[in-house]
Amino acid sequence: MRQKLDRLLEQAQINLTDQQKEQLVGFVRLLDKWNKAYNLTSVRNPDEMLVKHILDSLVVSEHLQGNNFIDVGTGPGLPGIPLAIANPDKQFVLLDSLGKRITFIKNALRELGITNVTPVLSRVEEYKEQTFDGVLSRAFASLNDMVDWCYHLPNPQGKFYALKGIYAESEVQEIKNPIGLEKVIPLSVPELVGERHLVLLNKPN
């Protein structure tokens, strides 16, 4: 699995240390193990997890601006855990409303020695503890839902980072809250079939 990860990272031009690579492989092994009992992801094959979960998360890394981020509807820690491993200097809150997912994340953090992640069991609309430089998600079906439910989370300079498949301009026009479209970045994920985009949105000051 490590060789496959090395190859994917090279193709994506992502540079990580040996320790970071081992943490990513360890995370996939844990996810695969827990998935058999807890059904955390529909992806069953660890090699596929490397592409669809790890690389698909890591390609966002170079676009992150700021120091503290929240991953909303993180599921088993995606994209939050791969991004936290790749960015040990940044802080991440991983939010999910399902207990088994947060239990898995806590276990993974402990086993892998990841110290820059805070897992939180909460519904997004009820989480008002702090604001963030970036609100990340690949969980929302529509941009309007993401902005609507997470509007209280970015700080004045903060941005929404929405990970999408196909980007539809009409989705931005359907957003009800005041919002600015900063840019849409096509993402290239090695060995992943289909389009991926990062949509950057900001709240007008």
UniProtKB/Swiss-Prot annotation:
S-adenosyl-L-methionine binds at residues 73, 78, 124-125, 138. The keyword Kinase does not apply. Its main location: cytoplasm. It catalyses: guanosine(527) in 16S rRNA + S-adenosyl-L-methionine = N(7)-methylguanosine(527) in 16S rRNA + S-adenosyl-L-homocysteine. Its EC number is 2.1.1.170. InterPro entries: rRNA_ssu_MeTfrase_G, SAM-dependent_MTases_sf. One of its GO terms (cellular component) is cytosol. The keyword Glycoprotein does not apply. Keywords: Cytoplasm, Methyltransferase, rRNA processing, S-adenosyl-L-methionine, Transferase. It is found in: Cytoplasm. Pfam families: GidB. Coiled coil: none annotated. One of its GO terms (molecular function) is rRNA (guanine-N7-)-methyltransferase activity. Belongs to the methyltransferase superfamily. RNA methyltransferase RsmG family. NCBIfam families: rsmG_gidB. Specifically methylates the N7 position of guanine in position 527 of 16S rRNA. This is Ribosomal RNA small subunit methyltransferase G. It comes from Actinobacillus pleuropneumoniae serotype 5b (strain L20). The gene is rsmG.
